[in-house]
Amino acid sequence: MTRAMHQVLLTCATMLACLPAAMPSASAAADGKRVAMFMGPTQDKYLGALSKSYETAATGSGMKVTTFSSPFDPALQAQQIDDAIAQKYDMFVVQIISQRAIIPVLTRVKNAGIPVVLVVAPMVGNENSAQDLYLTHVGYDDTKFGELIGEAMLKALKDTGRAKAKVAVLAGSMAEGKAPLREKAFRDAIAKHQGFEVVVTEDVKWNPAAGERAAGQLLARFAGQGGLDGFYGMNDVVANGAIQAAEGAGVKVGTTAGNLIVVGGNCQAPGVKNIGTGKQAATLLMLPVEEGKLAAARTKDYFDGNKPQKITFLPTETITKANIAQHAQACSY
């Protein structure tokens, strides 16, 4: 070996010795883990965006994600989960389709030793130790949602000079945990004010076409009783269905005296547009991309050997024409 070659090797060795040891990837523990995700209909813009966000974040940490979709069919979801148990996935991410039907299913999951992350809908109550059937829940506080949008409805009604009002609810799926929590909190908020009442709730399963049909039928039904004063569509596409039905029936929608008041939720593109044009009074901040990212982070936490906190609620706020501009981009998914 020449003196020059010896010097080169010595220099290289010195440089390598000075470099820090290769750090294991932050996702090393999660690398290669197989995750099965069970969602409602991913054609729904919120659920589709959440699923995509979760998969992108989890895949970035080395996980392999398979998504199963169900059209709010608890029997199909149970079958999908049972099939996945047999395939020995490392983690399940579940949107509860039916509170009652999911308990025996998740009991089988627990007995198989597979941890569960809940998204979208919470586990309600503790029947058969239901709160022990999942590792962590990531989502939004639906009771708070109902309260906030109820207060927004009341403000909009009172701002038009009304001293009393009849309001209808176009609900998401009442079999899951989410819609019933919102509906009850909304009713409670309205009931605090004498003369204001929720007169009917229709379960439209988050479907805008079903929401439009139900709204049209309710407008006709209450026409002989002085009419309805407001609609609460639990997401903005359902609220948009109510607006379409009202306009089709010749009922003026807006936020001024004599108008039908419509509020929504989940801050979606139709809501951004309708608030901007004055046809919708309010919505609530709810971002599926952020929910998906956080659920993936909680999954990674578990694989990294950490114990995620039991429940994590993302922040929300009421959105009206006064602040729609600052949220329009994030809500237009």
Please name every model-derived segment.
Residues A36-F38, K88-I96, P115-V119, V169, ...:
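Periplasmic-binding protein-like
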Residues T59-S70, K166-V169, I190-K205:
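Short beta-strand elements in bilobed, periplasmic/extracellular small-molecule ligand-binding domains
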Residues G32-S61, T66-D83, Q87-Y89, V93-Q99, ...:
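Extracytoplasmic "Venus flytrap"
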Residues Q77, T136-A165, G211-A215, C267-G271, ...:
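Hydrophobic alpha-helical segments within soluble ligand-binding/sensing domains
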